[in-house]
């Protein structure tokens, strides 16, 4: 069991770049490449952003740049950069 119903609306990379630190976010797009150290370059139609996905948060998902994925996480902002700290990765069919 668990919750079924409306959750967070999907945001774009452009919107995520303007959000506040620690704001929950859902993004749908592709991972273009690994940047090392559990960081990845993620893109959608509006741009690219760095996503940090801990190994255990992949939940067995294997993705290539051709796969569309949904990432649930929080905005992680510091003085110079915005990235997404992922909690969950879902492979879209």
Predicted regions and their residues:
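OB-fold and OB-like single-stranded nucleic-acid-recognition modules
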Residues: 1-93
